[in-house]
């Protein structure tokens, strides 16, 4: 592999994402400036200035015209992806933890943290309705939880959303009938769900958890299909767009890193066969746990973001591209 190492953040990465074509890489970290880069050469195009706290999540619309960020400064911001202008700001009483666009790019979802007397919430706003995009505006969909909702995403067009919780619970809601979840999975994870990502074709969902596992789920009913075990907590997992492979990233908890050798911390990204649940490759690079990862739409590149503040663009070599699994 021939990695590019990108240094544009002062603190630990929280999310990296590719746009639909894969020519741009979007990143955010525990500093206050989300960045956008050229994937091809690692050149930084610019940053989105306006947040005043750690930025926990970033997502980009299918046509790369808008991006959304969720921050610890109690705001979600929608940006003009090309010009970097802030289009809308949504305020809340507690920090925003995750965010995402729907398939059409017209709806934006986000989760908020549970804090003091405020419950954790999941909200959906419609960008086409300006009354929803102002402070105090009513949400298109609104739900409260006793347990922290840590991650959420749209899993089917603009209709279904899946939410992961600190307790390991997974729930799926239909926005057309929002009263109760249509599917629930309480058994797949024992600890916090750190990340949820959809397969490129939209038929599978992969969840990463602090219980040292990642799970492949049927997007229609959240039924567990496969489970991948690691030696350390899994912070992020992604699915290859053109092969039956998945990749896990994580490592020893960031609080323990100063007491951990690089080899014992399991800071490598690990590639598993999707069907056989067996690890067959891993790649190193980060000095500290991997917090986030994304598979490029071409299937030949993985981007990882670590606690060390670096983004690594890992391009696969011929050994991987020509690899066939013996079974």
UniProtKB/Swiss-Prot annotation:
Q: Where are the WD repeats?
A: 8-49, 51-89, 188-227, 229-268, 285-324
Q: Which GO terms fall under biological process for this protein? A: cytoplasmic translational initiation; formation of cytoplasmic translation initiation complex
The record's GO CC annotations read: eukaryotic 43S preinitiation complex; eukaryotic 48S preinitiation complex; eukaryotic translation initiation factor 3 complex, eIF3m
User: Major location, coarse class?
Assistant: cytoplasm
Where can this protein be found?
Cytoplasm
Q: Name one GO molecular function term.
A: translation initiation factor activity
The protein's matches in InterPro entries, at most eight in alphabetical order, are given as: eIF3i (IPR027525), WD40/YVTN_repeat-like_dom_sf (IPR015943), WD40_repeat_dom_sf (IPR036322), WD40_rpt (IPR001680)
Question: Where is the signal peptide, in residue numbers?
Answer: none
Lipoprotein among the record's keywords? Answer: no
Which terms are listed as keywords in the entry? Cytoplasm, Initiation factor, Protein biosynthesis, Repeat, WD repeat
Family of this protein: Belongs to the eIF-3 subunit I family.
Q: What does this protein do?
A: Component of the eukaryotic translation initiation factor 3 (eIF-3) complex, which is involved in protein synthesis of a specialized repertoire of mRNAs and, together with other initiation factors, stimulates binding of mRNA and methionyl-tRNAi to the 40S ribosome. The eIF-3 complex specifically targets and initiates translation of a subset of mRNAs involved in cell proliferation.
Subunit annotation: Component of the eukaryotic translation initiation factor 3 (eIF-3) complex.
This protein is called Eukaryotic translation initiation factor 3 subunit I
Q: Which organism is it from?
A: Caenorhabditis elegans
Q: Which gene underlies this protein?
A: eif-3.I
